[in-house]
Curated annotation (Swiss-Prot):
Protein name as it appears in the record: Interleukin-1 beta
Entry-linked PANTHER family: INTERLEUKIN-1 BETA, INTERLEUKIN-1 FAMILY MEMBER
Pfam families xrefs: IL1, IL1_propep
Chief localization: cytoplasm
Propeptide residue intervals: 1-114
Subunit structure: (Microbial infection) Interacts with African swine fever virus (ASFV) protein L83L. Monomer. In its precursor form, weakly interacts with full-length MEFV; the mature cytokine does not interact at all. Interacts with integrins ITGAV:ITGBV and ITGA5:ITGB1; integrin-binding is required for IL1B signaling. Interacts with cargo receptor TMED10; the interaction is direct and is required for the secretion of IL1B mature form. Interacts with HSP90AB1; the interaction facilitates cargo translocation into the ERGIC. Interacts with HSP90B1; the interaction facilitates cargo translocation into the ERGIC.
Miscellaneous: IL1B production occurs in 2 steps, each being controlled by different stimuli. First, inflammatory signals, such as LPS, stimulate the synthesis and promote the accumulation of cytosolic stores of pro-IL1B (priming). Then additional signals are required for inflammasome assembly, leading to CASP1 activation, pro-IL1B processing and eventually secretion of the active cytokine. IL1B processing and secretion are temporarily associated.
Gene name as annotated: IL1B
Gene3D superfamilies the UniProt entry points to: 2.80.10.50
Source species, domain of life: Eukaryota
Family: Belongs to the IL-1 family.
Organism of provenance: Sus scrofa (Pig)
Length: 267
């Protein structure tokens, strides 16, 4: 970086007052009273640049404060036939100041995945008061439990994730507490199917979950519904019969049960 030398005393002696000088500092130009050297702009050639040094009463060095004056039009005895216009300013400033491109960095999805995920533990029963239990390593069934068997009920870890949420639809995932299992929706035999999928606990849960794991939770009075985000109008459902697997159905409001009561165990 070039260093502006300190002006000699005899040069400073020839300075005069100019109340309209602008001083360019780190926080922007400021107008203030200062002592400046009287220079004849008419002696400058077209396109030349003059450095006007300001000598302040403050404790400022020449390196901190320099006024730049651009000779934009040479005074002439006869008035110019062409007025100075905006295009002339553009050409002068483009010559002095170099434009640099601004590079915008795209957001890395990893930061979204690493964001804290809000979760809560809960239990679900369908509107017929059937509880959801594990029947085998990868199957959920709905059945009525006696008081002594209530410990068999599955405890879900419901996580709030990204999705096309609205006022009454909240995107969530449903994992089983104590298991590396999540409910997910896949296509089998040309039919959307509900399954329990093994997951890597080091990667899940995360804010940006794959769509097959996401359900839109809708509250209707005191009950909730879970609609597949991947397959709209397909809901987590139970049969009216006892001990039948929990499945993904599209007969909402008919023979299949899509309404559940939710017991929150922890926020």
């Amino acid at each position: 970086m070039a260093i502006v030398p300190e002006p000699a005393k005899e040069v400073m002696a020839n300075y005069g007052d100019n109340n309209n000088d602008l001083l360019f500092e780190a926080d922007g130009p400021k107008e203030m009273k200062c002592c400046t050297q009287n220079l004849d702009l008419g002696s400058l050639r077209n396109g030349s640049i003059q450095l006007q040094i300001s000598h302040q009463l403050w404790n400022k060095s020449i390196r901190q404060m320099v006024s730049v004056i651009v000779a934009v039009e040479k005074p002439m005895k006869n008035p110019s036939s062409q007025a100075f216009c905006d295009d002339d300013q553009k050409s002068i400033f483009s010559f002095i100041f170099e434009e640099e491109p601004i590079i915008l960095e795209t957001c890395n999805d990893d930061f979204v995945c690493d964001a804290n995920v809000q979760s809560m533990e809960c239990k679900l029963q369908d509107k017929d008061h059937k509880s959801l239990v594990l029947a085998g390593p990868h199957m959920l069934k709905a059945l009525h439990l006696l008081t002594g068997d209530l410990k068999r009920e599955v405890v879900f870890c419901m996580s709030f994730v990204q999705g096309d949420d609205s006022n009454n639809k909240i995107p969530v995932t449903l994992g089983i507490k104590g298991k590396n299992l999540y409910l997910s929706c896949v296509m089998k035999d040309n039919t959307p199917t509900l399954q329990l999928e093994d997951i890597d606990p080091k990667r899940y849960p995360k804010r940006d979950m794959e769509k097959r794991f996401v359900f839109y939770k809708t509250e209707i009075k005191n009950r909730v519904e879970f609609e597949s985000a991947l397959y709209p109008n397909w809901y987590i459902s139970t049969s009216q019969a006892e001990q039948k697997p929990v499945f993904l159905g599209n007969s909402k409001g008919r023979q299949d049960i899509t309404d559940f009561t939710m017991e929150v165990l922890s926020p």
